[in-house]
């Protein structure tokens, strides 16, 4: 069973994440950052991942610590749920459109953290959500899941659409990369024999 429960408790935040990589896309989300909850829901639904995230953070200052720490904790949960990564496809990619916006996300569960994020949002905020925080979320995830992640918004005029296509594509890319390949059962998808 590929699931994990991870808690992160600091002076700034208290985060708990529960995931089931072989779920159906159900989510229970309570981060205190409504637009971010909407984006996390995209990961769950399009990744077919059952996801529960609860967060208490210093949002009276701003949402930075909460969003970043959810990324960290979700990354740790993925690493724990995938274990030694035997039998997974390892690589995943997706292109997702939403009206005028189009984004591409490519992920490699390589064990080597690296974020390559190319997004030029058309505005700085989506409602109350600072678009810079999307990158902070992905950086936290990458560092703690041990993945290489390429995020490219190829076009878009509406910042909400830009961000939503990125999170949907991320969910779909994760789903592909974490998929078990029966032909690779028990094998680590690397010529090194380890990831």
Curated annotation (Swiss-Prot):
EC annotation from Swiss-Prot or TrEMBL: 4.2.1.19
Location relative to the cell: Cytoplasm
An example Gene Ontology biological process: L-histidine biosynthetic process
Molecular function via GO: imidazoleglycerol-phosphate dehydratase activity
Gene Ontology CC annotation, any one: cytoplasm
PROSITE patterns to which the protein is assigned, alphabetical: IGP_DEHYDRATASE_1, IGP_DEHYDRATASE_2
Residues passing through the membrane, by range: none
UniProt KW keywords: Amino-acid biosynthesis, Cytoplasm, Histidine biosynthesis, Lyase
EC primary class: lyase
Main localization (coarse): cytoplasm
Reactions mediated catalytically: D-erythro-1-(imidazol-4-yl)glycerol 3-phosphate = 3-(imidazol-4-yl)-2-oxopropyl phosphate + H2O
Family that this chain belongs to: Belongs to the imidazoleglycerol-phosphate dehydratase family.
Name of this chain's protein: Imidazoleglycerol-phosphate dehydratase
The organism's taxonomic lineage, starting at the top: Bacteria, Pseudomonadati, Pseudomonadota, Betaproteobacteria, Rhodocyclales
Gene: hisB
